[in-house]
UniProtKB/Swiss-Prot annotation:
Listed PANTHER family: SOX DOMAIN-CONTAINING PROTEIN DICHAETE-RELATED, SOX TRANSCRIPTION FACTOR
GO molecular function: DNA binding; DNA binding, bending; DNA-binding transcription activator activity, RNA polymerase II-specific; DNA-binding transcription factor activity; DNA-binding transcription factor activity, RNA polymerase II-specific; DNA-binding transcription factor binding; mRNA 3'-UTR binding; RNA polymerase II cis-regulatory region sequence-specific DNA binding
Start and end residues of each stretch annotated as Disordered: 53-142, 346-382
Gene name, Swiss-Prot/TrEMBL: D
Any one GO biological process: dorsal/ventral axis specification
Compositionally biased residues, Gly residues: 60-69
Descriptive protein name: SOX domain-containing protein dichaete
Gene inactivation effect: Flies exhibit severe segmentation defects, including loss and/or fusion of abdominal denticle belts and stripe-specific defects in pair-rule and segment polarity gene expression. Mutant embryos also exhibit loss of specific neurons, fusion of adjacent ventral nerve cord ganglia and aberrant axon scaffold organization.
Chief location: nucleus
Length: 382
């Protein structure tokens, strides 16, 4: 190693080579004119040794021959740029410098490979962006021609966005709309003419164009479940109150003015349900009236025998009647009036108990007992 460092053909010693930076990039490595001459001298010496085939005696000569052969091989297969790096590696022959040259070569090769990878990846990205840019046109979507406001706002929007980069797009649109409304007709005229020209050009390019707006599908839940329920309930109410097979023959319904089942209130237009009164059917009322008349006749018969006791109706009939009526709403005056009408519907259907005589009961007495029975307060569970 000492002989190589003091060889007469080498223009500098190892001490000079130790001052160079390890792993230095090629752009930062600057060669002096003296070092360039030394490199040329080493190349000439190595080529002459390779041509002669001889080598100096001793281990040092073998090392120089091996290094010269390697230098000749590298010089024949590498570019001058890489040759300078290989020659600098032969000249220094120190561990740090040799590692530095190898590291520089490795780093350069790795950079070259990475650079090719970056170039290929950038090429793929550019191709992908190009395909994305051309994809809307491939779908065949034709844009609508711009109107006068769009022609005017296209330039104004750019200017506002340039002056206020932090302003949101919605705020810019609001400002543009307000400014467009404040413009005079004479100021709008150039943009209106431009919009007409663009429309005529669009019709010429696309004669078969027809604007087809893409309507958003309506959610069935937004229509409101109450709406469908009210329509269905309205039909049911009409069927309940409609003319049946025996309605026109002689059946009179005194409760035709009641609201239908689940009918919405008209003053509030809200779908609060109103319950249907099943106790107001004519058949049920006739049975109730017969039971009340029989109970009243029995009470009157007992009152005549026991000194006119206060008439009392069986609680079962009244409880069944009012339990059927007061299902979800309280209107005592309405039901009292209907009960009175129901009592007046059947004036001749008075029946007496089996043990009473037919001549002891008068219609006036029965009416008085019915009035007293209907005027009594009845406890109602709300």
């Amino acid at each position: 190693m000492a002989t190589l460092s003091t060889h007469p053909n080498y223009g500098f010693h190892l001490g000079q080579a130790q001052g160079l930076e390890d792993y230095a990039p090629q752009s930062q490595l600057q060669l002096s004119p003296g070092m360039d001459m030394d490199i040329k001298r080493v190349l000439h010496y190595s080529q002459s040794l390779a041509a002669m085939g001889g080598s100096p005696n001793g281990p040092a000569g073998q090392g120089v021959n091996g290094s010269s052969g390697m230098g000749h091989h590298m010089s024949s297969h590498m570019t001058p740029h890489h040759m300078h790096q290989a020659v600098s590696a032969q000249q220094t022959l120190s561990p740090n410098s040799s590692i530095g040259s190898a590291g520089s070569l490795g780093s350069q090769s790795s950079l070259g490979s990475n650079g090719s990878g970056l170039n290929s990846s950038s090429g793929h990205q550019s191709a992908g962006m190009h395909s994305l840019a051309t994809s809307p046109g491939q779908e065949g979507h034709i844009k609508r021609p711009m109107n006068a406001f769009m022609v005017w706002s296209r330039l104004q929007r750019r200017q506002i966005a340039k002056d206020n980069p932090k302003m949101h797009n919605s705020e810019i649109s609001k400002r543009l709309g307000a400014e467009w409304k404040l413009l005079a007709e004479s100021e709008k005229r150039p943009f209106i003419d431009e919009a007409k020209r663009l429309r005529a050009l669009h019709m010429k390019e696309h004669p078969d164009y027809k604007y087809r707006p893409r309507r958003k599908p309506k959610n069935p839940l937004t229509a409101g479940p109450q709406g469908g329920l009210q329509m269905q309930a309205g039909g049911m109410g009409q069927q309940k109150l409609g003319a049946g097979p025996g309605a026109g023959a002689g059946g009179y319904n005194p409760f035709h003015q009641l609201p239908p089942y689940f009918a919405p209130s008209h003053h509030l237009d809200q779908g609060y349900p109103v319950p249907y009164f099943g106790g107001f059917d004519p058949l049920a009322l006739s049975k109730l009236h017969q039971s009340q008349a029989a109970a009243a006749a029995a009470v009157n018969n007992q009152g005549q025998q026991q000194g006119q006791a206060p008439p009392q109706l069986p609680p079962t009939s009244l409880s069944s009647f009012y339990s059927g009526i007061y299902s979800g709403i309280s209107a005592p005056s309405l039901y009292a009036a209907h009960s009175a009408n129901a009592a007046g519907l059947y004036p001749s259907s008075s029946t007496s108990s089996p043990g009473s005589s037919p001549g002891t009961i008068t219609p006036n007495g029965m009416d008085g007992s019915m009035d007293s029975a209907l005027r009594r307060p009845v406890p109602v569970l709300y």
